[in-house]
């Protein structure tokens, strides 16, 4: 697949009409979704990569690409794949008619390597420093549009943000003692969240964080937020509300749950969806009135 040009923003007029109620403002910088689909999880079927497993009649990777393809505010999509399934993903992208997928690139051995490869490619493509980059695990197929919108909006105030879901369980921080783990501390539950994706950044921020991390051969982060937290500690990372349904499909045992979520999504009544959106708008308006 050949690389297509990334969208460049048009000059912003001096005066713009206010957006219609319930719509989101247009973006004046590129908003690039990086879909990470390069993993071959050891906890899944090694002969059947989970990104290509069908859930609800559609490959998992397509669910994730769909979410960004259908978001009007996302301008470009980069898909990072394992070379072993590159052909299959290219075929799917062509069959599904994704117009925002600019390039499909090979990932690295670890997640952090795949992100670094994508950032290098974006730099080569001339992406501006203030571009908004949303990095998403392909195996989180049910990310909601509200999480994507929230991530884009958060970058108007912060240079880094992550979707996260408030923990309903007490979280224990542990340390080793002999052959067992023991409790070291118990953080207050209201302050504990389960990290999800997308994790979003202004391009200059995440690029700088990765440049600093590259000098540390012992650093192996499990997500991109960790890179910013560890190497740019003065950069706050905003929390964007996630959802329990934004699960990460890690093992075969996750598939039945994913199928149930897919059935619920596919079976939603359009009238019920419209009613839910109206309730959300009313709740948002009420919240603004009480500020």
UniProtKB/Swiss-Prot annotation:
The record marks 43, 50 as: Transition state stabilizer. It catalyses: 2-C-methyl-D-erythritol 4-phosphate + CTP + H(+) = 4-CDP-2-C-methyl-D-erythritol + diphosphate. Coiled coil: none annotated. Pathway: Isoprenoid biosynthesis; isopentenyl diphosphate biosynthesis via DXP pathway; isopentenyl diphosphate from 1-deoxy-D-xylulose 5-phosphate: step 2/6. Residues 1-23 are annotated as: Disordered. Signal peptide: none annotated. It comes from the Bacteria. Pfam families: IspD (PF01128). Keywords: Isoprene biosynthesis, Nucleotidyltransferase, Transferase. GO terms for molecular function: 2-C-methyl-D-erythritol 4-phosphate cytidylyltransferase activity. The keyword Nucleotidyltransferase applies. InterPro entries: IspD (IPR001228), IspD/TarI (IPR034683), IspD/TarI_cytidylyltransf_bact (IPR050088), ISPD_synthase_CS (IPR018294), Nucleotide-diphossugar_trans (IPR029044). Its EC number is 2.7.7.60. PANTHER family: 2-C-METHYL-D-ERYTHRITOL 4-PHOSPHATE CYTIDYLYLTRANSFERASE, CHLOROPLASTIC. Belongs to the IspD/TarI cytidylyltransferase family. IspD subfamily. This is 2-C-methyl-D-erythritol 4-phosphate cytidylyltransferase. The gene is ispD.
């Amino acid at each position: 697949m050949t690389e297509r040009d990334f969208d460049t923003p048009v000059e912003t007029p001096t005066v713009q009409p206010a957006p219609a109620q319930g719509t989101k403002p247009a973006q004046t910088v590129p908003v690039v979704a990086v879909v990470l689909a390069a993993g071959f999880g050891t906890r899944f079927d090694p002969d059947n990569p989970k990104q290509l497993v069908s859930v609800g009649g559609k490959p998992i990777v397509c669910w994730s690409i769909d979410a960004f393809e259908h978001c009007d505010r996302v301008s470009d999509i980069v898909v990072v794949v394992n070379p072993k399934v590159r052909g299959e993903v290219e075929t799917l992208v062509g069959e599904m008619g994704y117009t925002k997928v600019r390039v499909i690139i090979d990932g690295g051995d670890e997640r952090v390597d795949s992100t670094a490869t994508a950032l290098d490619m974006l730099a080569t493509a001339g992406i501006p420093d203030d571009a908004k980059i949303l990095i998403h695990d392909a195996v989180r197929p049910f990310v909601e549009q509200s999480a994507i919108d929230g991530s884009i909006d958060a970058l108007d105030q912060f240079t880094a943000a992550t979707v996260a879901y408030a923990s309903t369980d007490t979280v224990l921080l542990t340390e080793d003692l002999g052959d067992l783990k023991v409790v070291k501390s118990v953080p207050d539950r209201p302050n504990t969240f389960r990290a999800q994706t997308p994790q979003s950044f202004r391009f200059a921020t995440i690029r700088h964080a990765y440049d600093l991390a590259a000098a540390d051969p012992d650093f192996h982060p499990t997500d991109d937020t960790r890179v910013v937290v560890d190497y740019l500690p003065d950069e706050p990372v905003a929390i964007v509300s996630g959802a329990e349904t934004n699960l990460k499909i890690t093992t075969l045992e996750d598939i039945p749950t994913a199928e149930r979520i897919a059935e619920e999504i596919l079976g939603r009544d359009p009238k019920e969806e419209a009613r839910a959106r109206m309730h959300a708008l009313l709740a948002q308006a009420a919240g603004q009135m009480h500020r």
